[in-house]
Amino acid sequence: MTACLVEVGGELRAHGVRPDGLPWRVAVEVPDASGAHALAVPLRDQSIATSGDYRRYIEQAGRRYAHTLAPRTGKPLDNDLASVTVIHPECMLADGLATALGVLGAAAGADYAARHDLAALFILRGAAGHEVRATPAFAALLDRP
């Protein structure tokens, strides 16, 4: 097999290109119930993984409690991040990094990603809706043909 796009448990791995010679295109969801997409990402010989609190959570007394726990406190994360998406050559690392950057939070996660030249997309939840922030490495991937 010379080309394929494989999905396992929400993570995707692209090998080669589509039959028409173009990269595989993968949509990044807006983390709400709308089913809308924030953007489409071209993938060629890379993996993509997203970690967020918009699918697995409970709400109590108006607060959202995610399935991801903060390692220092053992409590559910409490930050403004709705999701983090990472593109990386290794699928397992993309998945682990997406979770780790989410645990760090928007500011510290973006700082870590920029220092390590990681392609990461942060979607933050705010009063006016969602805000999308991409690291320089992620933005560069969007500009590729």
Question: Where are the regions a protein language model picked out?
Answer:
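Mature catalytic core of soluble alpha/beta enzymes
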Residues: 1-145
